[in-house]
């Protein structure tokens, strides 16, 4: 099991390199139909698995196509990561949509409603 500093370093490197690949390295048109942002990367302690959290901005139908494109490009992305980072084995990649970006406004609305309710009770 790798130490936490090594895990964090690999997560940062993966985020940087995958972001670069998404912009310049992958030619699949499906991936370029929506704006993709990597919000975070979580790497397992044994460095064998990585969850890449992404936010997608664009039409819902196109978001699904982007995810299909990413799934099909996994092998290419892993091979490029192994080559660029000079790793014997690159981690198994799992792309997940980051729900935090969409839930943020809902949480703020709830907090604002609670604040208004509290102020009305104080009056």
Swiss-Prot record:
GO function term, MF aspect, one: ribosomal small subunit binding
- Superkingdom of this entry's organism? Bacteria
Q: Which GO terms describe its biological process?
A: maturation of SSU-rRNA
The transmembrane segments are none
Q: Major place of localization?
A: cytoplasm
This entry carries the following GO cellular component terms, namely: cytosol
Pfam families in the record: RBFA (PF02033)
Q: Which UniProt keywords apply?
A: Cytoplasm, Ribosome biogenesis
Q: Where in the cell is it found?
A: Cytoplasm
- What InterPro entries does the annotation carry? KH_dom-like_a/b (IPR015946), RbfA (IPR000238), RbfA_dom_sf (IPR023799), Ribosome-bd_factorA_CS (IPR020053)
Summarize the subunit comment.
Answer: Monomer. Binds 30S ribosomal subunits, but not 50S ribosomal subunits or 70S ribosomes.
Q: Which PANTHER family match?
A: RIBOSOME-BINDING FACTOR A, CHLOROPLASTIC-RELATED (PTHR33515:SF1)
Q: What is the recorded function of this protein according to its Swiss-Prot or TrEMBL entry?
A: One of several proteins that assist in the late maturation steps of the functional core of the 30S ribosomal subunit. Associates with free 30S ribosomal subunits (but not with 30S subunits that are part of 70S ribosomes or polysomes). Required for efficient processing of 16S rRNA. May interact with the 5'-terminal helix region of 16S rRNA.
Under HAMAP family, the record lists: RbfA
Q: Which family does it belong to?
A: Belongs to the RbfA family.
Q: What is this protein called?
A: Ribosome-binding factor A
Q: What is the lineage of its organism?
A: Bacteria, Bacillati, Cyanobacteriota, Cyanophyceae, Synechococcales
